[in-house]
Amino acid sequence: MNISPASLFTDIPRQLPEELCQTLFQNPNIRIERILSKGHYSAENTWYDQTQTEWVVLLQGQARISFVDSAPIDLNPGDYLLLPAHCKHRVDWTTSEPVCIWLAIHIQEENSNDYQNVGD
């Protein structure tokens, strides 16, 4: 078995014409992604409506997430959100410098309302 480290903060392309999502790990129930955003945002009048629960942390940069049914949230490095399945949301803005680095964990659950946000 060959186990070697990797870094979420390396191999960032200089040019990012669109948001870059890289799958780091995946099985039938979980997908872990690194997402790179450089001034990117959701298309106007577009809302994400995902079938999976998503836990996402902003590791670098700043961003704002809006929701259909609640106030927008500004995110700074270290801030994380637990987005239940079908929580309609969008990215209003992200910083270009520094590039935003996100770590997202998508969880496919039998009952998507059956989750616990530890720390609340």
Feature-to-residue mapping (PLM):
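Ligand-binding loop in jelly-roll beta-barrel domains
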Residues: 86-111
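A short, N-terminal "cap"/entry segment at the start of jelly-roll beta-barrel domains
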Residues: 1-47, 118-120
